[in-house]
């Protein structure tokens, strides 16, 4: 890819990441994304990515390798824990997200985007988006979590997975934003490790609660 084309692609990805995180994956205007990227040609985004889901997949691809590696490492530890240990599995969701949030606004945007997608029916994903989401390693984590969480039935279990994913990812992203604004009347924040452990404890308690 020529240098100019590569630079344009990166600008489009940055603009899309911000827009998807701020306005929603399905609400963000593709024309506005193109404008934010400084492109006069309205078809630039379609030229580089083909569609909304094409650019969405490309935005997520930036972080897939990191998430897959860290979740895989922590999942390996969790598999050696007792069969009723929920916290070690939940940590494989929380800790990689917290580490990604520390990498900068691109990582935080990715977390907000994934949190939104967690509320959607995976059956509606395109094959390309399904493939990207599966490569994050999250599906393997949730498969193990399903064997250790409280027996609440398929319907409540799926609801908890979606709610906890959204809760964890948005909590992590929001904390990172507050730290960026430190000194602007934001409330005091826990140190990183205490925050991670507290979030793991909260999410584990929710996943272990009996069926209502």
Predicted features, each with a name:
Residues 1-23, 32, 54:
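Basic, helix-initiating cap at the start of DNA-binding domains
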